[in-house]
Amino acid sequence: MEIKWHDSDPETGQRRFLCAERFAGVWNFRWKLQRRGEWTRGLEPTRAMWEHVLDMLERRYWRRDGVEEADIKQVKNLLAKAIRQEEIHNSPD
């Protein structure tokens, strides 16, 4: 399953194309700066990326586009983990 979208690169402000792909129960993210460019793998997903993936899965689920409830639960768990890591990283010590 693939979910594609675009956003702005937080470092440069340039438009970038993103892809979240689930294969064998594992999510991988990749990006590119040009529409027809090569994909760069190994992107570490942010909270916003997980929120976008969850939103897209929930939309597809109601249309039955190959999304199962287990997929949504998995992404919700990964999003909760990303939120916890973000809170730990941003907490004042």
Model-predicted segments: where are they?
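Short beta-strand segments and strand-loop junctions that repeat across beta-rich extracellular domains
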Residues: C19-G37
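Domain-level signature for proteins that mediate thiol-based redox and metal-cofactor handling
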Residues: M1-I3, A24, E51-H52
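A general, composition-driven signal for non-globular sequence regions
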Residues: D9-P10, A24-V26, A70
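Negatively charged, low-complexity tracts enriched in Asp/Glu with abundant Ser/Thr
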Residues: M1-T12, L33-G37, H89-D93
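Mixed-charge, Lys/Arg-enriched low-complexity segments
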Residues: R36-D93
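Short, surface-exposed coil-to-beta transition loops
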Residues: G13-F17
